[in-house]
Amino acid sequence: MEAQIENGFACVEGGEWLFGMRQPAAVCGSLAPKRLPRGECGWWRRLFQPDRRRLQCADLDGRMWCGDRTRPFLTRIDLAGRVAVATEKLLLAQPSSRRLGALLRVVPFSYRNAVCTTVLEGGWAVVSTQGRTQRAVVADGETLGVKPEAVVAWTGRPPTGHCPRIRLRDLFLPRPPKSLRLNFHGPCVVWFEGSG
């Protein structure tokens, strides 16, 4: 499958859009070259490849839409932020961004067998590995304990509990640490896969 850059948009073969944003676009996923040509896509700051040519990191300024031939794997980003995207196995890896004045954090611990999409508030979307993503609203003064298996996203304060220091390369582990358990303190909204 080939991609072309046309007027700031990169589209896949057959005319279906792969990327669209208000700045020069670039090829996504395994289509990414190992070395980007000078003068082309100069805004592309860094290229992360923990999964060997499957992950990219882009600095966005504006709106963005992504999809593939069979199903969308990234939908609507309205605000500027740093987003990591890859094939349909991984939708979104965003350590932090601003969403309507609230802080939204998304930590996908695993991207194996990712087959469907869960859309969050404000146009954000993350991958649900097997359609098991749960949404919990935690009121002020309440606490939710989660032992995550794959995807964790939340608004509000950072969680407490046993939370190992996570680096970018660690976000894409085949499986999360066995001892990982997070406590979310309200008011907040939490999306997660696992037991809570």
Residue ranges and their predicted role:
Residues 1-196:
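Composition-driven recognition of glycine/serine/threonine/acidic- and proline-rich low-complexity segments
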